[in-house]
C-alpha cells in the first residue's frame, strides 16, 4: 500500500500539472486557437478528476 507521503507527492505533482495545463489552455484561448484550447480543457478536467479521486482515496485509506 502506498504511504501517505507518496500519495501527497502524487497529489502535489498532479496539481502542478493541472495548473500548467490550465495556463496553456487559457493561453490557447487568448491566441484564438480554439481547437487546442478545447483539448487542453478536456485534459484539465481529466487531471482534476484524477486529483479529486487521489485526494479522496488518501482521506479514506
What are these regions (language model features)?
Residues 1-27:
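N-terminal acidic leader/helix
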Amino acid at each position: 500500500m502506498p504511504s501517505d507521503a507518496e500519495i501527497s507527492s502524487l497529489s502535489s505533482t498532479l496539481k502542478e500539472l493541472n495548473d500548467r495545463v490550465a495556463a496553456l489552455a487559457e493561453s490557447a484561448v487568448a491566441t484564438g486557437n480554439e481547437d487546442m484550447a478545447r483539448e487542453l480543457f478536456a485534459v484539465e478536467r481529466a487531471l482534476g478528476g484524477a486529483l479529486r479521486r487521489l485526494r479522496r482515496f488518501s482521506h479514506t485509506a
